[in-house]
Design a protein with these regions (language model features):
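Membrane-helix boundary elements
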Residues: 8-10, 21-46
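Non-cytosolic membrane-interface motifs at loop->transmembrane helix junctions
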Residues: 36-45, 74-77, 101-111
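Juxtamembrane helix-break-helix junctions at the cytosolic face
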Residues: 62-75, 97-98
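Core segments of alpha-helical transmembrane spans in multipass integral membrane proteins
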Residues: 19-24, 44-67, 80-90
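Short, Lys/Arg-rich, polar N-terminal cytosolic tail immediately upstream
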Residues: 1-7
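Membrane-helix boundary connector in multi-pass membrane proteins
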Residues: 91-108, 124-125
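Membrane-water interface at the C-terminal end of transmembrane alpha helices
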Residues: 115-129
Length: 129
């Protein structure tokens, strides 16, 4: 029971984070590009909006899975996908930051990405019973 509550919190937290990120990327692409110092070229705007669509899709997948059992063999594909997403995102953001690209967007994203990567990794190796 306690594990179900913990994974419900994990799914809710990651869904809300990805939903906020997805809405921002989908509806404010020019503003986000300006914040990062990137030009608002049409193809970059398109890539930002497509990234937002993917974040929204991921958010709804996590949100709709909140009532399911996680850990061990239960919902392993979704757990692995979340581990891969947040771990890869964390490494990418940390790599950018160590290369000297430390701005508000990186700082705002790196903390939740690292926390969620570790949380999902823990869910991957935790038994639900």
């Amino acid at each position: 029971m306690a594990t179900d509550i913990k994974t419900r919190w994990l799914l809710t937290t990651s869904a809300l984070f990805l939903a906020v990120l997805g809405v921002a990327l989908s509806f404010l692409p020019q503003e986000i590009l300006a914040l990062t110092g990137a030009p608002a070229a049409p193809r970059l705007v398109l890539l930002v909006q497509l990234s937002g669509a993917m974040a929204l899709a991921w958010a709804i997948l996590n949100w709709m899975s909140r009532g399911q059992r996680f850990g061990g063999i239960y919902n392993r594909p979704l757990t692995l996908a979340n581990v891969l997403h947040f771990a890869t995102g964390s490494v990418t953001l940390l790599k950018m930051m160590t290369a000297g690209a430390v701005g508000l967007p990186e700082v705002v994203l790196v903390v939740p990405y690292v926390v969620l990567a570790l949380w999902w990794a823990a869910a991957l190796v935790t038994s639900p019973v």
